[in-house]
Amino acid sequence: MKEILYVKVRKCSKDDKVECFQIAETFKAKIIDYGKDSVLLEFVQTATKNDAVIKLMKEEFASIEVVRGGSVGIESISMMER
């Protein structure tokens, strides 16, 4: 089961942004928004992987905000069956 996790890195420098983009690429995250001094990332993965992301982000950056959305279930349907 996967869950949604949003991490906002605040008060980040240009080097911090580069690091955020590398983390996003490694964990297959989406960059939802970025500004002059912040980056917002969206992760959709298992709770265990999201725990690892949070731990890493806390170690790497001084100021982060975390929002977890809980488990997500997605059903696939075929349009041909309708």
Located regions from the model:
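Long, contiguous binding/interaction regions
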Residues: 1-82
